[in-house]
């Protein structure tokens, strides 16, 4: 089945690098195509693709844009809203055209505001903190951008679109990074999952991470699949950890931060299976040489690493049945 409602997480930096690949995807999913200006090679408008040519229903796309995207590409937000206004006028059935229901579909943070403001809620593994993270995501996404570029508070419209969503998509184009190298990925992707849970729709939307690091071979993976790929390829790869040992204090900090970011996905979205944390434990505290290195180079990072594993275990986000792990954590077997 085709997805019925899809939320796209739009970042300004990625839009610059890909020349708007994500936005073009949003247009195509809605059954639209960009109209190009021959003189400048810029997008000057849009064309509506007929259903007969699409051979599928139009997909209800909601754009959650970052503050940077809002400021750098106001024309794209306006273009999308203008296009869906025209779709609302089409003589098509509601089953084929969800845009017959007229409502804002481009949302972002308050003017002048950036980021999601999840903060400490990512590190506190209580239900209350998860709810606070979801509320922060909603609050930072509650301003609608219309076809004239006017930005208004539209929390109710946002929540309505989210409750209809069955898919969430984030695209990554940078080959030199991954979703465990910065907390922003967890804040945006797992934060959406926390927001859905806040609305009583936890698990209703599938979470997808699109890999566009090789433009000629794009890959779509579930968020769990992408996390497993990154853990096995880098985070739990002994060669990577050994490489970090050459960077002293900073290398030890990167090892600890990688676990922090994986933990945030587990806390906010529940998408990290136990065996991935087992792999992380084996690759870090399970290596005597790595523990000795961190103790010498950055004992604070080592203490943070141990505390993070312990907090995950105590919160029930990671359950290990291995006595050696439980002994290292100081927990009863």
Task: Describe the predicted segments one by one.
Residues 1-333:
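Ligand/cofactor-recognition surfaces for anionic moieties
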